[in-house]
Amino acid sequence: MEILDMTVEQLRNAILDKHLKSEDIVKAYFDNIKRNEPEINAYITLCEDYALKEAKDVDKKIANGDKVGRLAGIPIAIKDNICTDGIKTTCASKMLYDFVPPYDATVIKKLKAEDAIIIGKVNMDEFAMGSSTENSAFKITKNPRDITRVPGGSSGGSAAVVAAKMAPISLGSDTGGSIRQPAAFCGVVGLKPTYGLVSRFGLIAFASSLDQIGPLGKTVKDCAELLEVISGEDELDNTSSKKHEKEDYLEGIDDGIKGMKIGMPKEFLNDGLDPEIRKCIDDTIEKLKSLGAEVCEMSLPITEEGLSAYYIISSAEASSNLARFDGIRYGYRPDDFEDVYDLMETSRSEAFGDEVKRRIMLGTYALSSGYYDAYYKRALKLKKKIKNEFKEAFENYDLILSPVSPVLPFKIGEKKADPLQMYLADIYTVNINLAGIPAISLPCSVSKEGLPIGLQLLGPHFGEKKIFRAARALEKER
C-alpha cells in the first residue's frame, strides 16, 4: 500500500514494525505537498526542516528500543489559529501576519508528548469567520475534489490537506460548523467534540462559548485516535470539563448499532435541502435500519431559530475577543499615525478583512445600550432553550441524524458577495455549537457531478463513543 493511502493505525504499525521509517513518511508527504500545494493553496506555513528533524529523532528512539508515543512519526497539519511555539500563527489575517507564539496550545503539547510531527499550518477563513476559506488574507484554498469549488470553512485548509493526501490527519476548530462543513465538502471525516472535552488554551478565540478544537482524518478510527490524544481536563482552560473521565474511543468502535434508536428531525428535511443530499439522507436511513438500528422521525422546532441566535452570540463574543488587536500590544501596526487613537483606528481598518469587520460591527451593535436586551439577551435565552431541547431529545434517542449543509460544495466566488446566503449554509451545524453537544461529519455519497456529500451524527454531551460506533458502522458499508 502507498504511504499516502495509509491510515494512522497502518502508519503506526509500519513504523513500530520497522517496515517504514518516520523520515520516509514525512518525505512522502512533503513530496506530495510540493506537487499539489501550488494548485490547492492549503498551507500558510510549511515546517519541512523541523518535521524531518523530529522524524529522525523518532526513528532513533525506535532503533534504540526506547518507548515512543501513540502517534510516533505521524505527520499532522494544524489550523493556523492554534498556537505553536516558534511557528508562525496568523489566523489567516494581516493583523497577525508575522505573529510567532512563545508557547504551545495545550493540544499541541499533547501531540508532541505522543511524538506526532507537525508538518505545517493550514489556511482558514480569517479569525475562523466564514464558510468557504475565501476570507483568508493570504490565499483562497481550493477543493481537491473540484478545484473550481470551495473546500468549505472555516477549517477549509484542514479538510483540504487530508483530502489531497497532503497530511494524514489534521486539527481544526469548530464554532458553528467549521470542522464538519469542510469535512463534508472535501469528503473526509471531521468531529466537533463536546464543548469542554478538548482544551481551548492556545486557540485564538473567535467566540469563546462556542469554539472547540477537533480532529479531521481519512477514517472514523483516525479521528477517534486523535481525539483520545487531545482530549482531557486542562487547568489552563477553566471551561474544560473536570467531571468527565478520559475514554478509550477505539474500544467497542466496531460493535455495530443494533438496538440503537436514532432520530431524524423533520425540520432538517425542508425545501431548502438539495435533492441529492436528501436522497443521501434517505438512503442512510435505510442503511441504518438494515444494520439493526431503529430510525424515527422526530421534531426539534426551536432549532429553526438557531441561526439568528448563533450569529448574534458569536458576533458579540468576537467583538469582545478581537478588541485586543489594536496595534499597540501586538499585531499589525501602520507606519504612519498621528496619535494613539489614529494608531488603533488605522491598525484595525487596514488589517481586518471585510467579514471580520462586518461581524465586529454586528456584535458591537448587539451589545450596545438599548439593543442588548432585544438582541444579545434574547439570543442567550434561545441558546438555553436549544440546549434543553436537545437534552430532552437524547432522553429518547441515542443519536440524531442530520445533513451537514443544505447545499453541495459551491463555486469559488459564488456566494462571496452575498453574506446572507453564506450564513444560511450553516443552518444545520450551528445548533450543535449552541447546545455544546458533539457531532461527526462523515462521507455519505457523491453527487452526479462527483462532489462529496456528507452527513452528520449528533450525540448527547460526552456521547463521542456512541457517535464513533455508529459512524464506523456506516463507514464499513460504503
UniProtKB/Swiss-Prot annotation:
EC number: 6.3.5.7
Gene Ontology cellular-component terms listed: glutamyl-tRNA(Gln) amidotransferase complex
Keywords for this protein: ATP-binding, Ligase, Nucleotide-binding, Protein biosynthesis
Single Gene Ontology BP annotation: translation
Recorded GO MF terms: ATP binding; glutaminyl-tRNA synthase (glutamine-hydrolyzing) activity
Catalytic residues (UniProt): K79 (charge relay system), S154 (charge relay system), S178 (acyl-ester intermediate)
A Pfam family per the record: Amidase
Catalytic activity field: L-glutamyl-tRNA(Gln) + L-glutamine + ATP + H2O = L-glutaminyl-tRNA(Gln) + L-glutamate + ADP + phosphate + H(+)
UniProt keyword Nucleotide-binding, yes or no: yes
Gene3D superfamilies listed in its UniProt record: Amidase signature (AS) domain (3.90.1300.10)
Highest taxon listed in the record's lineage: Bacteria
HAMAP family xrefs: GatA (MF_00120)
Function: Allows the formation of correctly charged Gln-tRNA(Gln) through the transamidation of misacylated Glu-tRNA(Gln) in organisms which lack glutaminyl-tRNA synthetase. The reaction takes place in the presence of glutamine and ATP through an activated gamma-phospho-Glu-tRNA(Gln).
Quaternary structure, from the entry: Heterotrimer of A, B and C subunits.
Family per similarity comment: Belongs to the amidase family. GatA subfamily.
Protein name: Glutamyl-tRNA(Gln) amidotransferase subunit A 2
Native species: Clostridium acetobutylicum (strain ATCC 824 / DSM 792 / JCM 1419 / IAM 19013 / LMG 5710 / NBRC 13948 / NRRL B-527 / VKM B-1787 / 2291 / W)
Lineage of origin: Bacteria, Bacillati, Bacillota, Clostridia, Eubacteriales
